[in-house]
Structures are given as C-alpha cells and as structure tokens.
UniProtKB/Swiss-Prot annotation:
Membrane topology according to the record: Multi-pass membrane protein
Main location: membrane
Keywords per UniProt: Cell membrane, Disulfide bond, G-protein coupled receptor, Glycoprotein, Lipoprotein, Membrane, Palmitate, Receptor, Transducer, Transmembrane, Transmembrane helix
GO cellular component: plasma membrane
Cytoplasmic topology ranges: 53-82, 133-150, 228-263, 319-371
Record-linked InterPro entries: GPCR_Rhodpsn (IPR000276), GPCR_Rhodpsn_7TM (IPR017452), NeuroY6_rcpt (IPR000986), NPY_rcpt (IPR000611)
Protein name: Neuropeptide Y receptor type 6
Biological source species: Mus musculus
Sequence intervals crossing the membrane: 32-52, 83-103, 112-132, 151-171, 207-227, 264-284, 298-318
Protein family according to the UniProt entry: Belongs to the G-protein coupled receptor 1 family.
Statement: the UniProt record of this protein carries the keyword Iron-sulfur: no
Location in the cell: Cell membrane
Length: 371
C-alpha cells in the first residue's frame, strides 16, 4: 500500500512523458479553487488526525495507571502509527505534488518513503491484533485470552515486521534529474530540479514488490479482519436471541446492536478509505499509460486525501463515540487550560464485551458505551 509523497512523480517522470511539469502548462493547470479546497481538506485532516490520536493516547495512558487493558494498548499503538502517517505523509505529499519536484534532499527522499510505508503497515497490523483480541474475547471466551504482556510483544513484532517489510523502498528511492531532461519547455525553470523516484533493477522486481506490498498491507489483512468481525457479528446475533428468550434487559440488546454496527463500520471505513489509492497504485504499476494525463497529480492527491481520512476515522470510532472518552477529553482540555488537577474517573475498557458463562447459563455482560 504505497502512500508515498513521491508516488505521482514516477508516473509522469519515468522517461515516458512530457507531462512532468504539467502544472506549468496553462491547459493542465488545476483550478485554483480545487487546489485551495484540497489544501483546506488536508489541513483539517492533519489537525484532527494529530489532535484526535494524541488525545486518545494521553487518555489511554492515564487509564493504564489504574488498570492494564489489552485493547487500550493496541489502540494507543494504532493512534501512534496514525500520527506518523499524518506527519510523514500529508505535508511532504502536498508540497511535492504542488511543486512537482523534490526539495528535501536525498536523505528525506529515502526516509519519508520508508517511514510512510512503515506507518501504514503498523496501522493495518494493529487493526489485525485488535480483531484477534476481540475475536478471542467474544467468540472464544473460554479459550486463550491475550494479556497485557502479549499486547506489548505483539506491538514489538508488528513494528519489526513493518520495518523489515519496507526496507526495499528505502533502498529503491533516489534523487535524479533524468525525468526533466527531455522536457520541451519555453523556460529553463526545471534545469536544476530533481525528482524523488523509485529506481529498480528491473520492471519485474518493481511489480513483484509492489504487488506483494499490496497483498500484505491491504488485501490479506483486510480479509482476515473481515472474517474475524463476521464471526463476531454472528456470535453476537446468536447470543442476542438467547438473551431475548430469557427476557434480559433490552438496553443490553440495543448496545449489542450498536457494537455490531460499530464493528462493521470500522472494517468498511478502513477498506473504503484505502481502496481508491490502492486502485491508483495498481493501475500505475501495471497499466501506467492509463494515467498519463495532465490531471494525473490531481487524481493521485484526491485518492491520497481519501486514504488520509482513515487517520481521523480511527479516533472517531475508538474514542469520540465513547461517552466516557468525551468526558475524559473535556477534563483533559480543562486541565491543560486551567492547570487544575483532574478528578479521578472510572476506567472504561475499550473492549467490546465479555461473557459470563456459569452453571450452564450464558448472558451478556455489560457492554461499554464505546469500543
């Protein structure tokens, strides 16, 4: 799942086009209003993504002092990776796409691409761990239960996997002025400009890596998460019918339905946010001629913008829909502004639910007001 700041430039500067400086040509220049709206959208996402995820991390760590919780730890790791995505993806992508050449040096050329790929990998793998934890908690409550130590080891493992998986990107990106050599421009504004592009030993190597990255960063993890949540939903439905027959409290049934919708929304939203950019990358890698137009960068930025929305969606689902989180957030803001100590508050685990199986009786335990 390549979300690199330099993704658009290889398309239009790989020795195949005279479109490299399409912003220069009046006929290809995107409308000012479109650029302005994109900049505003990116700014809003950047602020919401950083503020939302940072708030979630702070509140979770404050809760961890009172009670260790596996799901909270995994959510904090997810929020950390989302912050890295905001910091390393959005600013460099916007600047590089609008300027149409790289101005941050060779080290940042390699580092930004590498960190971006690592961040995306950590995000999706964190979602996988959360799905596994919820599956064990709900579908298999009597089986193996992840503990806090398992959560930390899992986080270390996914960071190591992500760091290793993205090494080829670090090695393949280089600065070069070759894309600008064959341009026919009325001025020499691009004479000394360079682009940050992927340079592979062969096209086959690039296709193998990009396809493998797509499978490992998107298709396979998303499919696994979907299966886990599907089984969770089916399990919750079955238990809902059992609770209904026992005439249990209907408020619990309503919470059950809300959790079902929440679980499905998480998966659907993540998949939908990253789908356009993945389609763009697949087309670029296999049928790049389809993208050789003066509006190539604009299409890429729109796809990238939609993907970046996922950094705001995660805090929304995992935190802002949690009434206890909203209360804690207001207390945190009040503490930051007024400097007054926060009141003690109840630790609310962000897990979905747990079951109480005793004496052959199955009943739903209390489901928190947020995941």
């Amino acid at each position: 799942m390549e979300v690199l700041t330099n993704q658009p430039t290889p398309n239009k500067t790989s020795g195949k086009s005279n479109n490299s400086a399409f912003f220069y040509f009046e006929s290809c220049q995107p409308p000012f209003l479109a650029i302005l709206l994109l900049l505003i959208a990116y700014t809003v996402i950047l602020i919401m993504g950083i503020f939302g995820n940072l708030s979630l991390i702070i509140i979770i760590f404050k809760k961890q002092r009172e009670a260790q919780n596996v799901t909270n730890i995994l959510i904090a790791n997810l929020s950390l990776s989302d912050i890295l995505v905001c910091v390393m993806c959005i600013p460099f992508t916007v600047i590089y796409t609008l300027m149409d050449h790289w101005v941050f040096g060779n080290t940042m050329c390699k580092l930004t691409s590498y960190v971006q790929s690592v961040s995306v990998s950590v995000s999706i793998f964190s979602l996988v761990l959360i799905a596994i934890e919820r599956y064990q908690l709900i579908v298999n409550p009597r089986g193996w239960k992840p503990r806090v130590a398992h959560a930390y080891w899992g986080i270390i493992l996914i960071w190591l996997i992500s760091l290793t998986l993205s090494i080829p990107l670090f090695l393949s990106y280089h600065l070069t002025n070759e894309p600008f050599h064959n341009l026919s421009l009325p001025t020499d504004i691009y004479t000394h400009q360079v682009a940050c592009v992927e340079i592979w030993p062969s096209k086959l190597n690039q296709l193998l890596f990009s396809t493998s990255l797509f499978m490992l960063q998107y298709f396979v993890p998303l499919g696994f998460i979907l299966i886990c949540y599907l089984k969770i939903v089916l399990c919750l439905r079955k238990r809902t019918r059992q609770v209904d027959r026992r005439k249990e409290n209907k408020s619990r049934l309503n919470e059950n339905k809300r959790v079902n919708v929440m679980l499905i929304s998480i998966v659907v939203t993540f998949g939908a946010c990253w789908l356009p950019l993945n389609i763009f990358n697949v087309i670029f890698d296999w049928y790049h001629e389809m993208l050789m137009s003066c509006h190539h960068d604009l299409v890429f930025v729109v796809c990238h913008l939609i993907a970046m929305v996922s950094t705001c969606i995660n805090p929304l689902f995992y935190g802002f829909l949690n009434k206890n989180f909203q209360k804690d957030l207001m207390m945190l803001i009040h503490h930051c502004w007024c400097g007054e100590p926060q009141e003690s508050y109840e630790n609310i685990a962000m897990s979905t639910m747990h079951t109480d199986e005793s004496k052959g009786s199955l009943k739903l335990a209390h489901i928190p007001t947020g995941i």
